[in-house]
From Swiss-Prot:
It catalyses: L-lysyl-[protein] + 3 S-adenosyl-L-methionine = N(6),N(6),N(6)-trimethyl-L-lysyl-[protein] + 3 S-adenosyl-L-homocysteine + 3 H(+). This is Ribosomal protein L11 methyltransferase. It is an enzyme of class 2 (transferase). It comes from the Bacteria. CDD domains: AdoMet_MTases. One of its GO terms (cellular component) is cytosol. Its main location: cytoplasm. It holds the Pfam family PrmA. HAMAP family: Methyltr_PrmA (MF_00735). InterPro entries: Ribosomal_L11_MeTrfase_PrmA, Ribosomal_PrmA_MeTrfase, SAM-dependent_MTases_sf. It is found in: Cytoplasm. It comes from Actinobacillus pleuropneumoniae serotype 5b (strain L20). The lineage of its organism: Bacteria, Pseudomonadati, Pseudomonadota, Gammaproteobacteria, Pasteurellales.
Amino acid sequence: MAWVQIRLNSTDKQAEQISDFLEEIGAVSVTFMDSQDTPIFEPLPGETRLWGNTDVVGLFDAETDMKAIVEALIASRLVEADFAHKIEQIEDKDWEREWMDNFHPMQFGKRLWICPSWREVPDPNAVNVMLDPGLAFGTGTHPTTALCLQWLDSLDLTGKTVIDFGCGSGILAIAALKLGAKQAIGIDIDPQAILASGNNAEANGVADRLQLFLAKDQPQDLQADVVVANILAGPLKELAPNIITLVKPQGDLGLSGILATQAESVCEAYAPDFNLDPVVEKEEWCRITGVKK
């Protein structure tokens, strides 16, 4: 099926109104895109934070009268009469196949591979985690996830308990279990993440060793030999007292989701309780690790 799209620029305040209107007049999907390469950090849970200068892209069936769409936008008064816009025909492709072709097995450290379920594992004797891209964050493609996976691969997890704080897809907890951990515990504020982690654990045959909790239901006396938290700098600092108590004495801590420019302030929150290692950087992101005193 062929498609046509309209792209127009908007402020963050109007973008959602324009999106709603485009859907009302027949758009099959609407996408927000950054028009000025502006980073967005640390939205609140449930918040959709947009760029100050946002491109709104509405996708329509190719038979749609786009002149009528433009006229409807003007009549809605959500845009000026002479608003700048671009209309493009979209090539008809097997989008699912193209999407699948973009994901390949990835190696982290010496032993660990993350593989999409539709790909053949490169090394059957390696530690293979089968994980498909989904709604919850974490497939190994982001530098922060890669940093955490490499760190877990470097540890001897045999017989240990691991907490994945902010578990998302469950990728870190599942990797830890496959790397030898006796038990893993995933904690997240998002029910979608709990569901995704459970499904991914089932697919990897480790569901019987993974416990999952919404953050509000986290047991009070919970502790582990290893705690990994791949969230963001703000929550890592705000939740430091909680995260610190999760780590057993002499236990290992790994933190990421941190921009390199934020490393110093995050280290300050944990340094009193941990002997911290040198910060490891990947692209603009970094990882902080240490052993509890």
